[in-house]
Amino acid sequence: MVVTAHLDHLGVNTTGQGAPYYAGAMDNGAGVASVLEIAREMAAAKVKPKRSVLFVLVTAEEKGLLGSKYFAGKPSVPPASVVANLNMDMALPLWKFDSVLIYGIDESTMGDTAKAAAKLANLEVVADPYPDRNSFIRSDQYSFIRAGIPALSFKFGFKADTDRAAIEKAWRAERYHALADDLSQPVEKAEAVKFDAFLAQLITDVANEPATPQWKDTSFFKRFAN
């Protein structure tokens, strides 16, 4: 299985005003940090998962998923051995991690594993509050989906018309693809640690499943596996 996050953001600020570059702390420095920390913890663990796990940091997501598209098409391992993708992109650790939003949770058997892991961690699994955004196909997981590989992506949970939704809306208005997405913004670091622990457990659970993840018969995306 492959765990991904994108390294790139928007690059140099050419306006002559403000910071000289776009830091991209949430999009996607936080995702990269999660992948690195989970990789470190899993590499140090005495008990290894039954299935190998590749941690891959890709580039040019903001230019059209170019890095992940290349890797999904020409992986560093035999293509048939890539059976799942978990992608970290803009999880937004801005509030307590007591619920999780998982894009693609109803599309493959991996979603059932994710639900079980969330239950064990006392996390509520919330539905996508804005399905019209089509978030499941708007980050690097889509490159793997197009290659027929089941995938998931994650955010701190929130529901529409709540205080958390208002925070998310304000973040998008003020910081998304803006110079303000930098290290000066408030971050719930202790909650981010809990998020990483949940993901590490889920990765381990998926890697230890005797059967490889499969698209559900009801999933639109199953057509890419044929």
What are these regions (language model features)?
Residues A25-A33, V47, E62-L66, G104-S108, ...:
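Soluble non-cytosolic domains of exported or imported proteins
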